[in-house]
């Protein structure tokens, strides 16, 4: 089934707690994940909370990558939403799994904007002129 995008909703467990609390490193690894997926980075913003935790977003031309960390639990919640056929969110997922040193993960892939649900003919090109 064709869709406008793919959205990975990922749970990362037993991650490196120091990595999860390092805002500069998290931003660097999220941008690298976007790059490895084939995405085009538009902008990013990240924030470190006190006493610990990081939240951030990398806005890409093809949608976004987000992260929220709980270093005290070794846990990160990650969303990787990409549109188009040239970007692979699974490459971003694999990069982040390694970078955060996650020992366990759970991930679900959702099709966003399924052609059959919004009335786009299956043989339509992904990009259309409006």
UniProtKB/Swiss-Prot annotation:
Reaction it catalyzes: S-adenosyl-L-methionine + H(+) = S-adenosyl 3-(methylsulfanyl)propylamine + CO2
Domain of life (superkingdom): Bacteria
Needed co-factor(s): pyruvate
Pathway(s) this gene product operates in, as recorded in its UniProt entry: Amine and polyamine biosynthesis; S-adenosylmethioninamine biosynthesis; S-adenosylmethioninamine from S-adenosyl-L-methionine: step 1/1
Single biological process term from Gene Ontology: spermidine biosynthetic process
Keyword presence, S-adenosyl-L-methionine: yes
Site residues (Cleavage (non-hydrolytic)), renumbered to this chain: 62-63
Modified residues (Pyruvic acid (Ser)): 63
CC per GO annotation: cytosol
Cofactor note: Binds 1 pyruvoyl group covalently per subunit.
Post-translational modification: Is synthesized initially as an inactive proenzyme. Formation of the active enzyme involves a self-maturation process in which the active site pyruvoyl group is generated from an internal serine residue via an autocatalytic post-translational modification. Two non-identical subunits are generated from the proenzyme in this reaction, and the pyruvate is formed at the N-terminus of the alpha chain, which is derived from the carboxyl end of the proenzyme.
Pfam family, one: AdoMet_dc
E.C. designation(s): 4.1.1.50
Keywords: Autocatalytic cleavage, Decarboxylase, Lyase, Polyamine biosynthesis, Pyruvate, S-adenosyl-L-methionine, Schiff base, Spermidine biosynthesis, Zymogen
Bilayer-crossing regions: none
Record-annotated active site: 63, 68, 83
Family: Belongs to the prokaryotic AdoMetDC family. Type 1 subfamily.
Function: Catalyzes the decarboxylation of S-adenosylmethionine to S-adenosylmethioninamine (dcAdoMet), the propylamine donor required for the synthesis of the polyamines spermine and spermidine from the diamine putrescine.
Assembly information from the UniProt record: Heterotetramer of two alpha and two beta chains arranged as a dimer of alpha/beta heterodimers.
PANTHER family: S-ADENOSYLMETHIONINE DECARBOXYLASE PROENZYME
Protein name: S-adenosylmethionine decarboxylase proenzyme
Originating organism: Thermotoga petrophila (strain ATCC BAA-488 / DSM 13995 / JCM 10881 / RKU-1)
Gene name, Swiss-Prot/TrEMBL: speH
